[in-house]
């Protein structure tokens, strides 16, 4: 036991292990999604064409590559999510239920007052934020492991209106946000009847507890 806080030490260890594996599972999901949206360049023939078509239909890009500077239209706003899910699934857009985004994107949405935080009432009857937000009714998961691309500035070259002209462009940071529908990814238990257990060795060092 933690003599300073009265907290069960092994319970703390279990909680830390749970958080660790939750983070690993989240990393795995993001790696899978990154792979899915990279498949437009994979395969051959009809398969490559189908892969590219899927990625194109399910990607809503507001970065406006080639623009001279970053504008408000290149940032998330009140219409971005609705437009993106409509492009992907049309009248089935209501099936989307989870948004995964970078904290910079989430902060921008907060500043625009587009995120609504779930609330609960504590034992004193005071309503408090739960710390989990929704955007247009979709749960928002914030993770700084989301893909981030730093796009370099481009200097103007050539003459405007002539062949080979390249317009100037400011440097900017491009963030990727994923929106998932119900059943997009299934999480299945491995089937272990006892995923972990405690073992105690009373004869060693006055008694040791081991989490196995």
Where do the model's predicted regions map?
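Alpha-helical scaffold segments that mediate packing/assembly in large oligomeric complexes
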Residues: 2-87
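Signal for well-folded cores of large energy- and translation-related assemblies
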Residues: 22, 89-90, 110-114
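Structured, hydrophobic secondary-structure cores that serve as assembly/anchoring elements
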Residues: 1-9, 85-108
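Sequence/fold signature of self-assembling virion shell proteins
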Residues: 51-83, 104-106, 110-212
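Residues at beta-strand starts and edge strands
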Residues: 11, 15, 94-95, 205-209
């Amino acid at each position: 036991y933690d003599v300073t806080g009265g907290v069960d030490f092994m319970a703390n260890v279990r909680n830390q292990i749970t958080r660790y594996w939750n983070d690993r599972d989240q990393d795995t999901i993001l790696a899978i999604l990154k792979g899915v949206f990279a498949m437009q360049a994979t395969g051959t023939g009809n398969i490559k064409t189908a892969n590219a078509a899927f990625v194109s239909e399910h990607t809503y890009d507001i970065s406006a590559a080639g623009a001279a500077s970053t504008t408000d239209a290149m940032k998330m706003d009140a219409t971005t999510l609705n437009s993106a899910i409509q492009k992907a699934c049309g009248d089935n857009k209501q099936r989307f239920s989870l948004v995964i985004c970078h904290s910079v994107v989430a902060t921008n949405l907060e500043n625009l007052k587009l995120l609504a935080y779930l609330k609960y009432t504590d034992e004193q009857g005071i309503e408090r934020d739960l710390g989990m937000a929704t955007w247009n009714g979709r749960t928002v998961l914030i993770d700084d492991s989301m893909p981030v691309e730093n796009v370099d500035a481009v200097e103007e070259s050539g003459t405007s209106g002539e062949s080979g002209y390249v317009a100037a462009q400011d440097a900017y940071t491009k963030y990727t946000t994923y929106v998932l529908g119900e059943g997009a990814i299934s999480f299945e238990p491995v089937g272990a009847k006892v995923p972990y257990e405690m073992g105690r060795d009373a004869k060693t060092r006055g008694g040791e507890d081991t989490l196995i």
